[in-house]
Amino acid sequence: MFRTKRSALVRRLWRSRAPGGEDEEEGVGGGGGGGELRGEGATDGRAYGAGGGGAGRAGCCLGKAVRGAKGHHHPHPPTSGAGAAGGAEADLKALTHSVLKKLKERQLELLLQAVESRGGTRTACLLLPGRLDCRLGPGAPASAQPAQPPSSYSLPLLLCKVFRWPDLRHSSEVKRLCCCESYGKINPELVCCNPHHLSRLCELESPPPPYSRYPMDFLKPTAGCPDAVPSSAETGGTNYLAPGGLSDSQLLLEPGDRSHWCVVAYWEEKTRVGRLYCVQEPSLDIFYDLPQGNGFCLGQLNSDNKSQLVQKVRSKIGCGIQLTREVDGVWVYNRSSYPIFIKSATLDNPDSRTLLVHKVFPGFSIKAFDYEKAYSLQRPNDHEFMQQPWTGFTVQISFVKGWGQCYTRQFISSCPCWLEVIFNSR
């Protein structure tokens, strides 16, 4: 019997599904710590981002993540549940095949392209009926039935569960990317089911003191940089020089300049590499190596840093991050295969005198900056805010390696590869 192309595409898609219980590569789970955590052990090593993360919590510098109800990477999985797990796998396979076989050949090809590229290539939306729910269970084929979590899934949720996050349970755990046609639409007739047009939401958690909080100690600017402007707690000075003798701090505060909403600086340890990148479009990709990449390519910058650690981390940046300005603030989506670490004043408690470092796993999104919260942080009688009005408008992002009291790196200036994002407060 001749096998049709559609059947071959369905089998190929199923083989490309996300691993359910196998160990991920070291970088996905432990790239942030990598043997550099103080008192490291099971806390960081078992938190995997590509397939897990459970409730999607963004941990502090410890990188703690809550595993989902499915119990991925449990050190001692209960043997009594082996049969149930096998039955669930068979049910999921039957349901997935029944859904995929209803798709047209062109739709299957589009889905396969998105899955195999792992989001590295911009792929089109896969528009399918939005009111179809998929019932997961014995003798329950895909049909339009009332949602009964966790046994009933919408089509986008099912495909995300199969191809990205096996522990995914509810639509509230994911966020649609702004590049998607279904972004911002409520109950559309056709909804995009491309699993790489959605991201997993990070849920902030309160860290157990005293492990994740550290004082905001300022370092002095270097003597050779008279124009240095302290823009962050750790670097102590970022020497921004703009054409015409104006510092970038003055440029950011020019009332008539509204062409950009933020600028990005790339650092390798204590050295800034390349020029500032002004962002005008609502979305920006920051990457080292990205197929069909369009944005801020770190791989094209000339770096004289010969450190093996810097070169190793640089090679792991890969697809990097996506920075998007949306209605409720600025979001960061981790497109790479390794965790990123973020510090932002608007992610922390407004009453706190210290800031947290949040670990964001691959495939996860976090609202890294909130304009309303940032404005509320400005205190007119505070000398620091008077001298540096954009201090609360700065976000720091480190690739692969974390920093803070939990790590040997106390300051972000010790991280191999990191970004400083300064938002235009006007």
UniProtKB/Swiss-Prot annotation:
Domain (MH1) ranges: 64-207
Residues modified to N6-acetyllysine: K64, K70
One term under GO cellular component: plasma membrane
Record's subcellular location: Nucleus; Cytoplasm
Function as written in the Swiss-Prot or TrEMBL entry: Antagonist of signaling by TGF-beta (transforming growth factor) type 1 receptor superfamily members; has been shown to inhibit TGF-beta (Transforming growth factor) and activin signaling by associating with their receptors thus preventing SMAD2 access. Functions as an adapter to recruit SMURF2 to the TGF-beta receptor complex. Also acts by recruiting the PPP1R15A-PP1 complex to TGFBR1, which promotes its dephosphorylation. Positively regulates PDPK1 kinase activity by stimulating its dissociation from the 14-3-3 protein YWHAQ which acts as a negative regulator.
Subunit structure: Interacts with COPS5. Interacts with STAMBP. Interacts with PPP1R15A. Interacts with NEDD4L. Interacts with RNF111, AXIN1 and AXIN2. Interacts with ACVR1B, SMURF1, SMURF2 and TGFBR1; SMAD7 recruits SMURF1 and SMURF2 to the TGF-beta receptor and regulates its degradation. Interacts with WWP1. Interacts with PDPK1 (via PH domain). Ubiquitinated by WWP1. Interacts with TSC22D1/TSC-22; the interaction requires TGF-beta and the interaction is inhibited by TGFBR1.
Protein name per its UniProtKB record: Mothers against decapentaplegic homolog 7
Source organism of the structure: Mus musculus
